[in-house]
Amino acid sequence: MSLKEKTQSLFANAFGYPATHTIQAPGRVNLIGEHTDYNDGFVLPCAIDYQTVISCAPRDDRKVRVMAADYENQLDEFSLDAPIVAHESYQWANYVRGVVKHLQLRNNNFGGVDMVISGNVPQGAGLSSSASLEVAVGTVLQQLYHLPLDGAQIALNGQEAENQFVGCNCGIMDQLISALGKKDHALLIDCRSLGTKAVSMPKGVAVVIINSNFKRTLVGSEYNTRREQCETGARFFQQPALRDVTIEEFNAVAHELDPIVAKRVRHILTENARTVEAASALEQGDLKRMGELMAESHASMRDDFEITVPQIDTLVEIVKAVIGDKGGVRMTGGGFGGCIVALIPEELVPAVQQAVAEQYEAKTGIKETFYVCKPSQGAGQC
């Protein structure tokens, strides 16, 4: 049963009438451009064919009822006329409440709604299950009440909800690609202007995501430390963000910086340049160059930004040994575990899967999870 059928059926059973709309918003994987988003830089993600799906209908009062199919059909209910505060026990409900609360601040021309939510974006894997939920909820209200909001505004609203209501710092990339993704394309995003450029993906190339299943523990504290180090670097150059520093400017005075901060800055500057070049390589179908850029990105994350772990490095090495210069592979996401992403000619996917199955668990004691994805369309009706 599809997520659409599942949520529609649950909706009718729970609320006693049929849903009028079903909305989806996808998860994402970032092909290249890591930790560049909060430095006002460039990222190159694509939406994937794993999504959050919401069957919904408008109400003729000011009540919001939300059922979470993936959390034992837990039900949350709140009013649009009372201050929206955090739910005491359902963390999932706070993403919904946060989106609705921040949407009221942007455009309050909407009424009540009934929703049933389900999704298949793997949680805790760094594939943006939370952003896809935020964008899905925003899109539900936009569609049901014909709100004059575009995808970028729905994305910004989701980011605000996550930062301010849920209390988790994040850049804009995850929500933006979920809202604006394009089938068979990646999206080059300028995280300062929020300008986007669709970049066509080469035919016959699979987007493979492999979850190391290494439990991330440091991700919150270390993420914040990296942000602070980047801000320290920007202040040293008297610039609002590292986006505004050139590699030549950095090289001239790198020796004056704290050595750790210098390494962090070097990663951001070189990663930004790699990301812009990667968009061109993909457009030209130059998988060899794309693979080189992904390898450089991984080395930079490992050695300069220091956000990889041995399990992730092992996975990358296993995949690289199979694909050689016919594709690319690197860690993706915040770091300290999580996933790797690989662009692999479709005919090599079985060999990669076999090599990983034979070697990764033997070397690390952990069993991986393997996803073959398609670059997919952003949020909308399904």
Curated annotation (Swiss-Prot):
Q: Can you quote a single GO CC term?
A: cytosol
- Can the keyword Transferase be found in this entry's annotation? yes
KW Kinase (keyword) present: yes
Q: In which pathway does it act?
A: Carbohydrate metabolism; galactose metabolism
The annotated site for Transition state stabilizer falls at R28
Q: Which InterPro entries match?
A: Galactokinase, Galactokinase_bac, Galactokinase_CS, GalKase_N, GHMP_kinase_C_dom, GHMP_kinase_C_sf, GHMP_kinase_N_dom, GHMP_knse_ATP-bd_CS
Could you tell me the EC number(s) of this protein? Answer: 2.7.1.6
SUPFAM superfamilies membership? GHMP Kinase, C-terminal domain, Ribosomal protein S5 domain 2-like
Family per record: Belongs to the GHMP kinase family. GalK subfamily.
The record's function comment reads:
Catalyzes the transfer of the gamma-phosphate of ATP to D-galactose to form alpha-D-galactose-1-phosphate (Gal-1-P).
The name of this protein is Galactokinase
Q: Which organism is it from?
A: Escherichia coli (strain SMS-3-5 / SECEC)
